[in-house]
Curated annotation (Swiss-Prot):
Subunit comment: Homodimer.
SUPFAM superfamilies: Class II aaRS ABD-related (SSF52954), Class II aaRS and biotin synthetases (SSF55681), YbaK/ProRS associated domain (SSF55826)
InterPro entries: aa-tRNA-synt_IIb, aa-tRNA-synth_II, aa-tRNA-synth_II/BPL/LPL, Anticodon-bd, Anticodon-bd_dom_sf, Pro-tRNA-ligase_IIa, Pro-tRNA-synth_IIa_bac-type, Pro-tRNA-Synthase_IIa_type1
Gene of this entry: proS
Lineage: Bacteria, Bacillati, Cyanobacteriota, Cyanophyceae, Synechococcales
Protein's name according to its UniProt entry: Proline--tRNA ligase
NCBIfam families named among the record's database cross-references: PRK09194.1, proS_fam_II
Reactions performed catalytically: tRNA(Pro) + L-proline + ATP = L-prolyl-tRNA(Pro) + AMP + diphosphate
GO CC annotations on file: cytosol
E.C. code: 6.1.1.15
Gene3D superfamilies cross-referenced by the UniProt entry: Anticodon-binding domain, Bira Bifunctional Protein, Domain 2
């Protein structure tokens, strides 16, 4: 990597105002600092400064992958549809999540631009791995991925193309898979520590990659503007993405009702209004929420979920449960789960639904007779609702509720499920003495124990020691390289600009010449740049014909860790050394600049195991 660069010769144009397209501070700063430029929504050019950052991140990732036995390769970006159909994920990625770019070539064959490479790598393993003697194997690549995001936003956080490292491991048994999974866990932790980031590892939902039963963990870079909510215990014994988190809900209040009764409750279509009208706690109310599940055989299923009034539905957990019920409806997988809004309810063509006053026994007659609509409502009850006695719920008539209701008396108890959303303030399920706290995070890495999810449908097998054919055990491990770069900015910036961690900064030091017309300032700067480069210190030389104030503002904006200024102190044989992170400025002798910076940079790059 080039050790020094004159800023006057670089393609470098900064912006003084925040671009209107940007929402996050990190997105604004990357645009203003000439790190990226948008070509179209979700598609960005990586300019020279950011490209250096991405190269450094990639090299750290590469070193840590190689250290645990990973072998680098490069897989095709263009993938035939048939291998996705073989794994059973074509419909999920083109219809349900709809994030895959699908196209037809001139022969009419369906292709896709790879959002991920499980199918490609499994096909490769099926072709090349024959015997247990070849196992385990870990392959990885660093390349551009494509996802057709519905709403690309936040710069590199949610783009339509992005740089990612994805690794895949193959094993003879589950024990070997778990060992590599732990190796990856440690490698990912080292990557983020080496990149200078504060992070937390959390239990996570495996999504369409792993499926509802796969073990997985996410690596979250902590940032107040993070898209994901994390729940964790203060002692560090538990942390999970809110999509996966479990907890003990607060206890319900004691019911004042001892007998079943129908009450007129006009204008109480929300839990808040009903609780205020009856002067009761929302913990005594069973709310009933309608959803529609769409399976891959085209069947739509109305789902009525009963849950305690003070709780929210975790739709990821609900979708996972409905995925496990696919066989019940002669389907392979769930394509989509949606709240049954007015449009969906009208599409059912049944009796009117008393929205806001629905009871657990809402009649099936709200569903019309249709070919692709299940004739009966699937009824589920969250544990929080199932435990209530003498509760309040809808009366199946607009303006009416019932009080003093009980399961097994007025209403049959539906199938009981755990689909509530854990929240801050709940007690930890694993240690009830710990109260869950919340933080925001940016998902940077995700590791999965896939098990046999891909090897079974794609017939990827090996011959074991007894000569029997066995399916390969598999893991996959992703880390967003371009996403990590922006996450670092989101975590570390101030009002003046970016504060890059030393390990991934585009340059270690920027040498600023306040007045290029001063021969002494220029000659000292030139000598310093040469000496720093010789010492292996990456140096940006701001030799532009600009005012000193502009140069200082730009230096702060682009976030180079150290700034050397050849200014007034030259008369005393000194230059000014400013640390970007702290803003601390000191004057040091010119002859001590190289050794001082070398010591500081080496200290910053030293990461304990």
């Amino acid at each position: 990597m080039q050790q020094s660069q004159r800023l006057s010769q670089m393609l470098f144009v900064t912006l003084r105002e925040d671009p209107v397209e940007a929402e996050l501070p990190s997105h604004k700063l990357l645009l203003r600092g000439c790190f990226i430029r948008r070509l179209s929504p979700g598609i960005y050019t990586y300019l020279p400064l950011l490209w250096r950052v991405l190269q450094k991140i990639s090299e750290i990732v590469r070193q840590e992958m190689n250290a645990i036995g990973g072998q680098e390769c490069l897989l095709p970006q263009l993938q035939p549809a048939e291998i996705w159909r073989e794994s059973g994920r074509w419909d999920v990625y083109t219809q349900a999540e709809g994030i895959m770019f699908a196209l037809k070539d001139r022969q009419g064959r369906e292709q896709s631009l790879g959002p991920t490479h499980e199918e490609v790598i499994t096909l490769l393993a099926r072709d090349l791995i024959r015997s247990y003697r070849q196992l385990p194997q870990t392959l990885y690549q660093i390349q551009t991925k494509f996802r057709d995001e519905i709403r690309p936003r936040f710069g590199l956080m949610r783009g339509r193309e992005f740089i990612m490292k994805d690794a895949y491991s193959f094993h003879a048994n589950e024990e070997s898979l778990r060992q590599t999974y732990q190796d990856m866990y440690r490698a990912y932790s080292r990557i983020l520590r080496r990149c200078g980031l504060e992070f937390r590892v959390v239990d996570a939902d495996a999504g369409a990659i792993g499926g509802p039963s796969a073990a997985s963990q996410e690596f979250m870079v902590l940032a107040s503007a993070g898209e994901d909510e994390i729940l964790y215990t203060p002692d560090g014994s538990y942390a999970a993405n809110v999509e996966k988190a479990v907890s003990i809900p607060p206890p319900a209040a004691e019911s004042p009702y001892t007998a079943f009764q129908v009450l007129d409750t006009p204008g109480t279509e929300t839990i808040e209004k009903l609780a205020a009208f009856l002067k009761i706690s929302s913990t005594l109310i069973v709310k009933n929420v309608l959803y529609q599940a769409l399976y891959d055989n085209g069947l739509r299923v109305a789902v009525l979920l009963s849950i305690r009034g003070d709780q929210e539905v975790n739709e990821v957990k609900l979708a996972n449960h409905l995925s496990r019920l696919a066989e019940r409806y002669q389907a392979s997988k769930l394509l989509k789960l949606a709240l049954a809004d007015a449009e969906i309810q009208n599409s059912w063509q049944g009796d009117p639904i008393p929205v806001g006053y629905i009871a657990p026994d809402l009649p099936d007659s709200c569903l019309g007779r249709q070919k692709n609509l299940a004739p009966q409502i699937l009824r589920l009850a969250d544990q929080t609702a199932a435990l209530l006695q003498n509760f309040v719920t809808g009366g199946n008539q607009v303006g009416q509720h019932v009080v003093g209701a009980n399961w097994g008396e007025q209403y049959p108890l539906p199938e009981v499920v755990d689909v509530r959303k854990a929240q801050a303030g709940d007690r930890c399920l694993l240690n009830p003495d710990q109260i869950l706290e919340t933080a925001r995070g940016i998902e940077i890495g995700h590791i999965f124990q896939l098990g046999l999810k891909f090897s079974l449908p794609m017939r990827a097998t090996f011959t074991d020691e007894q000569g029997s054919e066995q399916p390969l055990w598999m893991g996959c491990y992703g880390i967003g390289v371009s996403r990590l770069a922006q996450a670092a900015v989101e975590q570390s910036h101030d009002a003046n600009g970016i504060i890059w961690p030393v390990a991934i900064a585009p340059y270690h030091v920027v040498v600023v010449v306040p007045n290029i017309s001063d021969p002494e300032q220029m000659s000292v700067a030139e000598k310093l740049v040469q000496d720093l480069a010789t010492a292996g210190i990456e140096t940006l030389w701001d030799d532009r014909d600009e005012r000193a104030g502009v140069k200082f503002k730009d230096a702060d904006l682009i976030g180079i860790p150290y700034r050397i200024t050849t200014g007034r102190s030259l008369k005393q044989g000194k230059v000014e050394l400013t640390e970007r992170a702290s803003g601390q400025a000191t004057e040091i002798p010119i002859e001590e600049v190289v050794t001082t910076l070398k010591e500081r940079i080496e200290a910053a790059l030293a990461v304990p195991d």
